[in-house]
Amino acid sequence: MAEETIFSKIIRKEIPANIVYQDELVTAFRDISPQAKTHILIIPNKVIPTVNDVTEQDEVALGRLFSVAAKLAKEEGVAEDGYRLIVNCNKHGGQEVFHLHMHLVGGEPLGRMLAK
């Protein structure tokens, strides 16, 4: 079994977070250090450390990440103008918490993906 993370405690509501969506498969909450006007983290309730650890058994939960992202983008008013979904993987990818998570960012022009 994967190690416990700070996100595990958010899922169980053991530490405070601004949860905007939660069901049996995923939890979504506002980032504590937002990088855009809208910045929400969407995570599977099961600890999956990185994208490299995804298995076929995770497909339903990971599909739910995307359907929840679309729902939240509409609710947040960013769906029409556009937004970005970001999943970082491991150190060089910028992953800081080793519990797979998707960033939904938007609400303003986001610029280029990567600087040259």
Swiss-Prot record:
Enzyme Commission identifier(s): 3.9.1.-
An example Gene Ontology CC term for this record: cytoplasm
Database matches in SUPFAM superfamilies: HIT-like
UniProt-recorded Gene Ontology molecular function terms: adenosine 5'-monophosphoramidase activity; nucleotide binding
Keywords tagged on the record: Hydrolase, Nucleotide-binding
Entry-linked Gene3D superfamilies: HIT-like (3.30.428.10)
UniProt superkingdom: Bacteria
This protein's name: Purine nucleoside phosphoramidase
